[in-house]
Amino acid sequence: MSGAGKKIADVAFKASRTIDWDGMAKVLVTDEARREFSNLRRAFDEVNTQLQTKFSQEPEPIDWDYYRKGIGAGIVDKYKEAYDSIEIPKYVDKVTPEYKPKFDALLVELKEAEQKSLKESERLEKEIADVQEISKKLSTMTADEYFEKHPELKKKFDDEIRNDNWGY
């Protein structure tokens, strides 16, 4: 197998291990989306299987002696010479170096956004827990107990009352 074909097969194999198919399937809502998703997965598996089997194998060496017996040796020698002179060009990747810095910068930005999102999620979860706690105790809670948890609100109400601005 040529170096480029083997590299493609290796990349596809690694990609198949890192794809969270079950996680993506859980996100789908409609039946049509599930059908399309299963078609995508089946197509990916077929292509990946082909890459792993068909393109990852080395070609069998040609038995030139066998052909010399059945065909004239001169013709076989010319074919062998032509076969040996064939050079398969190596793929030189010119695109990846161009986009790698941009991709790395996006990864850094992604990590920062992820951290920010996790902090915001944590804050919101705490806020939800507080609201749930208050909603459970609301029917039996006194104003003093509520103001104990929220002193800034008590100060605001006291200022309004002091200024004869009763809730307006």
Curated annotation (Swiss-Prot):
Task: List this protein's GO terms for biological process.
Answer: proton motive force-driven ATP synthesis
Q: Which UniProt keywords apply?
A: CF(0), Hydrogen ion transport, Hydrolase, Ion transport, Membrane, Mitochondrion, Mitochondrion inner membrane, Transport
Under InterPro entries, the record lists: ATP_synth_F0_dsu_mt, ATP_synth_F0_dsu_sf_mt
Pfam families under this entry? Answer: Mt_ATP-synt_D
Q: Which Gene3D superfamilies match?
A: 6.10.280.70
Q: Name one GO cellular component term.
A: nucleolus
Gene Ontology molecular function: copper ion binding; hydrolase activity; proton transmembrane transporter activity; structural constituent of ribosome; zinc ion binding
Compartment(s) of residence: Mitochondrion; Mitochondrion inner membrane
Q: What is its main location?
A: mitochondrion
Q: What does this protein do?
A: Mitochondrial membrane ATP synthase (F(1)F(0) ATP synthase or Complex V) produces ATP from ADP in the presence of a proton gradient across the membrane which is generated by electron transport complexes of the respiratory chain. F-type ATPases consist of two structural domains, F(1) - containing the extramembraneous catalytic core, and F(0) - containing the membrane proton channel, linked together by a central stalk and a peripheral stalk. During catalysis, ATP synthesis in the catalytic domain of F(1) is coupled via a rotary mechanism of the central stalk subunits to proton translocation.
Q: Its quaternary structure? A: F-type ATPases have 2 components, CF(1) - the catalytic core - and CF(0) - the membrane proton channel. CF(0) seems to have nine subunits: a, b, c, d, e, f, g, F6 and 8 (or A6L).
Which family is this sequence assigned to? Answer: Belongs to the ATPase d subunit family.
Q: What is this protein called?
A: ATP synthase subunit d, mitochondrial
- Please name the taxonomic classification of the source: Eukaryota, Viridiplantae, Streptophyta, Embryophyta, Tracheophyta
